[in-house]
Amino acid sequence: MIKISIDAMGGDFGPEVVIPGAAKAFERHPDIRFIFFGLPAQVEPVLARYPKLKEASEFRASEVAIGMDDKPSQALRAGRGKSSMWQAIEAVKTGDADACVSAGNTGALMAMSKFCLRMMSDVERPAIAGIWPTLRGESIVLDIGATIGADARQLVDYAVMGAGMARALFEVRKPTVGLLNVGTEEVKGLDEIKEAGQILRDTPLDGLEYSGFVEGNDIGKGTVDAVVTEGFTGNIALKTAEGTARQMAELLRQAMSRTLLAKIGYVFAKGAFDRLREKMDPNKVNGGVFLGLSGIVIKSHGGANAEGFCSAVEVGYDMVRNRLLEKIEADLAHFHHSHSHVSSKA
């Protein structure tokens, strides 16, 4: 049995999307047990529509719901101990839940997660890791918005954590990792990126294969299993990809409805277009993982639909089932030991 705590008030639509999304996840994974946190007047009527889910779940009342526009400091002051977001995170800390999922305010969720769960040993800053559809299948991209900027040490930690997530999620024994840069040549890029690359080249690692620098177009190609960057660049890349996917879907729709011949052609090609649309749908790959914390927290898109929230829950389910935290902690300990040994020899 895997227990997942849910911030039922998170996102643009709150319980009206969160609970149907959880119900979809429960249908697919009957071994999930949910703990919902939220305002009773809003959560209980929606939960009552799903009797099977309600029977297999627990509801705990909250006093406060964190707004999507609340500043992190404001959210901490107003919501600590009594908001649905805080209580869902705290359930992971106390061991009541194995993972937390929220579609709420990203800044508030990160601030509360850091304050409540603390960081893993030797990790300086957290990263948000996202699952990215590629020509080869899927890749991990991090950081996609936890913090702006990162030094070489932090980028290396991201690489180790991203590889651990790829191993857990994709069941790859030795994931390939690349540092996002403006070119693949070793002389290009910012000093911190070049230094991180040098550290990864010089340190022997069983858990990942460093593939050097990768460029923006390599993300969609699936050149590596995990792409590492800092949060400012990663978030721009994410939003650009999401916007491009929606643009392509709209352009296809317009093209296929322009003439009678195009409409007839669409009838025969509908299956292929539906598969393409599904692969490009952000809801199908929803769920950013907060890496570097001493507990599993999953961030769903605030505007996700029920299918999208279900995807975020499934990411949390897979992270728990594949023992993500234990693997990442072991990888980081091994890396820091190996790097200190290499540094002492230099």
UniProtKB/Swiss-Prot annotation:
Keyword ATP-binding appears in the UniProt entry: no
Pathway the protein acts in: Lipid metabolism; phospholipid metabolism
Example GO biological process: fatty acid biosynthetic process
Enzyme Commission code(s) on record: 2.3.1.274
Location(s) in or outside the cell: Cytoplasm
Subunit field text: Homodimer. Probably interacts with PlsY.
Function: Catalyzes the reversible formation of acyl-phosphate (acyl-PO(4)) from acyl-[acyl-carrier-protein] (acyl-ACP). This enzyme utilizes acyl-ACP as fatty acyl donor, but not acyl-CoA.
PANTHER family associated with the record: FATTY ACID/PHOSPHOLIPID SYNTHESIS PROTEIN PLSX, PHOSPHATE ACYLTRANSFERASE
The name this protein goes by in its record: Phosphate acyltransferase
